[in-house]
A protein has these predicted regions:
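A short, acidic, amphipathic alpha-helical segment used as a generic capping/interface helix at domain edges
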Residues: 167-183
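Alpha-helical recognition domains of nuclear gene-regulatory proteins
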Residues: 52, 93, 174-177, 200-203
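Acidic, low-complexity terminal tails and accessory targeting/binding regions
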Residues: 1-30, 103-140, 180-186, 199-254
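Catalytic metal-binding/acid-base residues of hydrolase active sites
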Residues: 85, 114, 195
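Extended, charge-rich low-complexity interaction segments
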Residues: 136-163, 249-254
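Generic beta-sheet signal
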Residues: 77, 183-195
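Active-site-proximal alpha-helix that buttresses catalytic centers in soluble enzyme cores
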Residues: 1-111, 157-164, 168, 214-222
């Protein structure tokens, strides 16, 4: 307990000081408590993903080649991200080469459905609802400004998760969206958060199927490919399931 208090109090003091700094310097849209930006460690991890996506495909398996071609934009796919800044920045840095190609209709679609499953303040977005332009956080590298301003799409963003929402509702809503006309491409590349993804695997993998993704968190910048299946029930509702055989760890892992 003493160790926790010793570590906790300086962090609180630093956070309050940063909030005051943002206020007096006219950066009221910034925050240290809420929607924490990408850290230096997170930036390095995202750069690691960017380097991986720039590697030759010569020594990859056929399945890995197929998935990486989707990631780099050689095969049709849609980029989507949580509405939290650290997820958006991770995707923007990791996929910078693809986004800088200026492929037609290629942008990061911001989704409330991918918002982290947590009550912590840093899991609350400070982004406004649909139609807003994104700005760099104070920790973001300058080159992200163009991507955030011109290669993001907030038309489907619904703001912060509602009070009556929960993790399962957002998981289901995301699956519904993947199969909807709003995301018309067959492949979807999602940037999100560790608890959200672990819950996703726990919910949609068969109950009896043992896999590390149900117990461990996906590391920041990690990439895993899978096939999400949809089945219509007799009642007319949809159920979703991850094909266990389709899970392919491409980078980072759990």
């Amino acid at each position: 307990m003493a160790q926790f208090i010793i570590n906790f109090i300086p962090g609180i003091i630093k956070s309050i000081a940063m909030e005051g700094y943002f206020f007096v310097t006219g950066q009221a849209q910034e925050s240290w408590f809420y929607d924490s930006p990408l850290s230096k460690k997170g930036l390095n991890q995202a750069e690691g993903l960017a380097s991986f996506l720039g590697e030759s495909l010569d020594y990859k398996t056929p399945k890995e080649q197929e998935l990486i071609k989707i990631l780099i934009g050689d095969s049709p796919s849609q980029l989507v991200s949580s509405n939290l800044r650290r997820a958006i920045s991770t995707m923007a840095v990791g996929f910078q080469a693809r986004l800088n190609k200026n492929l037609q209709n290629d942008s990061i679609v911001i989704l409330s459905e991918l918002q982290e499953i947590s009550r912590n303040p840093d899991a609350l977005t400070i982004l406004t609802t649909k139609g807003s332009k994104l700005q760099c956080a104070w920790t973001d590298p300058p080159f992200l400004e163009h991507i955030l301003m011109h290669r993001t799409d907030t038309s489907l963003h619904q703001g912060n998760k509602p009070i009556d929402s929960n993790g399962f509702k957002r998981l289901q809503a995301f699956c519904d969206l993947v199969f909807s006309d709003n995301l018309k491409k067959d492949a979807v590349i999602a940037a999100g958060h560790s608890l959200w993804f672990r819950s996703f695997f726990q919910t949609y993998l068969p109950y009896s199927f043992e896999h590390i993704s149900k117990k461990k968190k996906l590391i920041n910048g990690g990439c895993v490919g899978l096939v999400l299946q949809r089945v219509k029930t007799k009642e007319g509702t949809f159920k979703y399931m991850i094909d266990p055989k389709s899970i392919t760890v491409l980078y980072g892992g759990f």
